[in-house]
């Protein structure tokens, strides 16, 4: 991720963006043939729940496509990421959360998702990809480790709950309420003199342990 993400006091948007120049340097040094895929987390938990911009997703996609490298998202909090894009990235204010999520995934070859975050369920997850050959390989492995490809060891009840949760989480009112709850807590902590990671992310408030001590 970009260097600015490591400065907990810097309050700027999209601190989860990948440094594309560093990524290109890494590809040139290691060789594209030695890189299985690039993983882009949306949002970035490591940096305090910071979002990734559409502009950065496009830039990463263009670079990796040039080298024949796949891009997979850690999409566990992708709907939160879409909310931040709508709120902060020029040109997206009038777009629906759902349409922004769809555009985000148009720049990826696949993604992993935990059901316990933006899907609003207590269990499960899933893996998606647009490469049929890769899908067939994954399909063979899931039988060995999890269950049949159609359910992966999950109960039908949980898969249905996950589908409903995804639909409900894209409602702007819900996501706005959730993000602003985190901001409310963060602002209260700041007012009390507690150092936190800024800007406040979508799902949690992270303490700045170095300054806190």
Predicted regions: what they are:
Residues 200:
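Cationic-aromatic interfacial patches
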Residues 1-196, 207, 213:
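Conserved PLP-enzyme active-site core in the AAT-like
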């Amino acid at each position: 991720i970009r260097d600015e993400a490591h400065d907990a006091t810097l309050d700027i948007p999209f601190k989860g963006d990948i440094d594309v120049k560093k990524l290109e340097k890494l590809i040139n040094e290691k060789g594209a043939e030695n890189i299985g895929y690039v993983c882009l987390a949306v949002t970035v938990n490591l940096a305090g729940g910071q979002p990734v911009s559409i502009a950065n997703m496009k830039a990463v996609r263009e670079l990796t496509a040039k080298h024949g490298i796949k891009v997979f998202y850690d999409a566990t909090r992708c709907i939160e990421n879409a909310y931040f894009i709508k709120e902060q990235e020029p040109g997206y204010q009038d777009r629906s959360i759902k349409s922004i999520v769809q555009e985000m995934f148009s720049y990826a070859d696949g993604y992993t998702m935990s059901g316990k975050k933006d899907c609003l369920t207590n269990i499960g997850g899933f893996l998606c990809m647009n490469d049929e050959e890769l899908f067939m390989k994954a399909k063979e492995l899931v039988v060995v480790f999890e269950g049949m490809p159609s359910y992966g060891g999950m109960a039908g009840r949980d898969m249905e709950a996950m589908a409903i949760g995804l639909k409900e989480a894209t409602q702007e009112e819900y996501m706005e309420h959730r993000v602003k709850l985190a901001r409310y807590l963060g602002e209260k902590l700041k007012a009390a003199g507690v150092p936190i990671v800024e800007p406040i992310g979508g799902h949690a408030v992270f303490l700045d342990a170095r300054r806190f001590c």
